[in-house]
């Protein structure tokens, strides 16, 4: 009886609360408009592409800022999907070589870090980004690759990883022969496994390579790897597939994420970056029939779930690029990756190289997209508004300041009225300590004092009046490790 009375009491209290709840007339918000207050710096990007026929035109997809385009070689960028599509996270970009006005983009993130954004399928433009049409595949949620036939822009392959947090059927390799009006699923492994990488042999577009990745994400951890992680090949445009990952020379045991590339100079030469106990860079010189391991350095395969991307040079069969925290180049067939290409930001995720000029390239990293026209010796700046903030709050300043923690970067506080144009742009915003995924709060009585968190339970206190910052976390040691020189 007591339990029944308690239940009735709770329900009655809930009904009273609902009855007293205020209803807000949404017309009061109709005149409110969004405005950009900054910062003018880039955030994470997973996909990019350029056009062989238009040497100054490039695209990159932001994980939270849509698709961006430049027509002057990366000096100025502009968003081309804002207000035109219903997806803000663009993970795959492909430009048709025969008509650069045709661009396909895929939504969602497939580098499955702890905080990711899902997409809603594939979009297409036929006028260089002025207008867009949704082509379906909405339930894929995370698309890793889009590949356009080199001579027929209506033939397109999509590699879909699928739902990051659960099983679903709309994953695998999809193909269209009518520009995206209809799709056919040509490779499906299981509801638990999607596609991590996909590439077309430029010398014979009927030959396609794909890698399947068995992965499952939770907010607190990720399971990756299993018996369905494999390397696949089709010789008939996706009609049938054969497995290459059990061929002689490939690692035995459980595999994880695999990246794949084929040399445009020699179609028999393949490279794969394989996550496994005996993983590393593997090369085949007979189109996948046999393999040899050429390199197993940790710098190329650390945090495989976040990287595992490899790219063949379009002119030199001995040159291959591997992306990880840093950007590496090999000129001896993948044996040594001793040339590090310096880019404006770390954590590299995608690379497009002009098939007609290997000095022209664009890369995507955790700072956005950047362009090089000299083979990576120099790059354009990443000064566009694609900053990815994990958390935001406001202060009691007048006018109030907006404070946020940026992915793979510092925290930042910006006056809500934006840049006053009365001081240098560099003084527009200020760091308040902490970083990346941490929460921030300012003191209610003194808004110039900030408490900010970061990865690994780090906590700092920052006093803006004297620029003093100090660590105040409960445990004083950085749990991820310290150099031996700093130990007592």
Language-model segments: residues:
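Bacterial N-terminal signal peptides
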Residues: 5-15
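Sec/Tat signal peptide C-region and signal peptidase I cleavage site
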Residues: 16-21
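Beta-propeller blade termini and top-face loops
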Residues: 22-488
């Amino acid at each position: 009886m007591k339990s029944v009375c308690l239940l009735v009491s709770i329900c009655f209290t809930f009904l009273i609360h609902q009855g007293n709840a205020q209803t807000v007339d949404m017309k009061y918000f109709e005149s409110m408009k969004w405005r950009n207050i900054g910062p003018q710096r880039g955030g994470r990007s997973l996909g990019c592409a350029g056009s062989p026929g238009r040497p100054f035109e490039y695209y990159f997809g932001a994980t939270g800022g849509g698709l961006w385009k430049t027509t002057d070689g990366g000096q100025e960028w502009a968003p081309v999907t804002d207000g035109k599509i219903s997806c803000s996270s663009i993970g795959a970009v492909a430009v048709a070589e025969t008509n650069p006005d045709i661009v396909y983009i895929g939504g969602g993130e497939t580098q499955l870090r702890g905080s990711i954004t899902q997409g809603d399928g594939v979009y297409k433009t036929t006028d260089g980004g002025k207008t867009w049409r949704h082509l379906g595949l909405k339930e894929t949620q995370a698309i890793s690759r889009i590949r356009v036939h080199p001579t027929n822009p209506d033939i397109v392959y999509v590699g879909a990883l699928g739902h990051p947090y659960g099983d679903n059927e709309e994953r695998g390799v999809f193909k269209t022969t009518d520009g995206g009006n209809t799709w056919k699923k040509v490779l499906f492994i299981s509801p638990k496994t999607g596609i991590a990488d996909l590439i077309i042999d430029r010398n014979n577009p009927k030959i396609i390579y794909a890698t399947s990745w068995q992965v499952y994400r939770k907010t607190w951890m990720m399971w990756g790897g299993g018996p369905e992680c494999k390397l696949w090949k089709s010789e008939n445009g996706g009609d049938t597939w054969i497995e290459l990952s059990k061929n002689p020379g490939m690692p035995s045991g459980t595999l994880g994420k695999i990246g794949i590339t084929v040399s445009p100079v020699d179609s028999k030469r393949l490279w794969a970056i394989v996550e496994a106990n005996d993983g590393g860079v593997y090369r085949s010189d007979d189109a996948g029939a046999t393999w040899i391991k050429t390199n197993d350095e940790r710098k190329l395969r650390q945090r495989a779930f976040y990287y595992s991307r490899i790219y063949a040079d379009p002119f030199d069969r001995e040159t291959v690029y591997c992306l990880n925290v840093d950007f590496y180049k090999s000129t001896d067939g993948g044996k040594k990756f001793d040339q590090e290409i310096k880019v404006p930001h770390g954590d590299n995720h995608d690379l497009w190289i002009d098939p007609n000029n290997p000095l022209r390239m664009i890369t995507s990293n955790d700072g956005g997209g950047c362009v090089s026209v000299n083979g990576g010796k120099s790059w354009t700046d990443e000064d566009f508004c694609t900053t990815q903030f994990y958390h935001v709050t406001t202060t009691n300043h007048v006018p109030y300041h907006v404070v946020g923690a940026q992915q793979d970067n510092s925290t930042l506080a910006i006056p809500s009225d934006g840049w006053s144009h009365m001081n240098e742009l560099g003084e527009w915003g200020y760091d308040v300590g902490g970083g990346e995924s941490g929460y921030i709060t300012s003191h209610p009585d003194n808004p110039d004092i900030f408490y900010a968190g970061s990865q690994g339970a780090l906590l700092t206190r920052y006093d803006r009046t004297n620029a003093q910052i100090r660590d105040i976390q409960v445990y004083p040691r950085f749990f991820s490790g310290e150099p031996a020189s700093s130990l007592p």
